């Protein structure tokens, strides 16, 4: 009976204890050594607990070579392929089909918002980084959404009640989805954040909702851009950061590709 106790206290005890964060995480970012993660149960457990609680964890000491990313990912589970392949190389290239493959700065976003079920975890692994610029940026979407609920309840209600449309299309595919920016469970707890202005399509909502929805979205976006919420991190070769793609938004500063090399690899997995 204790195992199946459904009292509020028992349910709360079984539920993962989230630790919402803001810019203070720059001093307390969960960080692990790659060898501990790869070779010990304690290291793997620490990685999983960091993802569950903070939504983000940094690995140091990964051999800075192509292919290491998938070894790290498969320590946890099966890699989830996307329309970009089993993994992808984040480099500046001519005629890109995604903004990640440019040198421009990227605003905070979650990946694959145009999928009905975006992947749970994203991994980014630095192989080379000698360019000027290109620092990574992260924010806890659950923290920002929680603060939005306190500051502007109507904006929160709109973004959690009405869907946004997302679309990615190129010569090979056309993938679309529709979902709220903030997803709640049956008790009103925030369970997902889906935000990507690169993939956001025109709204398909009743006309009276269009202006209020844009205003609510703008309020949320302005909060996301507040440096008080930001984790700022320069990924050096051998560093691999993993984060909950349905909670933690990521972006980057622009960089000058003429000043050196920048080569990251990324992939996705579900927990």
What are these regions (language model features)?
Residues 1-14:
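Short, structured interface segments
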Residues 16-56, 66-271:
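Active-site environment of non-heme Fe oxygenases that use a 2-His-1-carboxylate facial triad
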Residues 61-63:
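Structural motif
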């Amino acid at each position: 009976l204790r195992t199946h106790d459904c009292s509020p206290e028992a349910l709360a005890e079984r539920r993962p204890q989230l630790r919402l964060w803001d810019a203070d995480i720059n001093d307390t970012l969960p960080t692990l050594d790659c060898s501990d993660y790869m070779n010990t149960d304690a290291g793997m457990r620490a990685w999983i607990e960091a993802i569950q609680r903070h939504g983000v964890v940094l690995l140091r000491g990964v051999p800075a070579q192509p292919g290491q990313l998938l070894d790290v990912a498969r320590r946890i589970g099966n890699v989830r392929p996307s329309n970009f392949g089993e993994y992808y190389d984040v480099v500046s290239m001519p005629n890109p089909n995604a903004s990640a493959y440019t040198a421009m700065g990227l605003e905070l976003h979650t990946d694959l918002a145009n999928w009905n079920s975006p992947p749970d975890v994203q991994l980014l692994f630095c192989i080379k980084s000698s360019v000027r610029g290109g620092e990574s940026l992260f924010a806890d979407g659950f923290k920002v959404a929680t603060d939005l609920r306190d500051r502007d309840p109507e904006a929160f209600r709109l973004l959690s009640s009405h869907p946004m449309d997302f679309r990615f299309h190129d010569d090979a595919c056309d993938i679309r989805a529709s979902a709220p920016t903030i997803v709640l469970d049956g008790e009103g707890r925030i369970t997902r954040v889906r935000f990507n202005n690169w993939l956001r399509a025109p709204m398909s909502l009743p006309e009276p909702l269009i202006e209020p929805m844009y205003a609510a979205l703008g309020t949320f976006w302005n909060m996301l851009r507040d440096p008080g919420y930001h984790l700022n991190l320069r990924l050096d070769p051998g560093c691999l950061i993993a984060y909950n793609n349905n909670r933690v938004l990521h972006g980057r500063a622009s960089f000058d590709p003429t000043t050196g090399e920048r080569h990251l690899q990324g992939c996705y997995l579900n927990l």
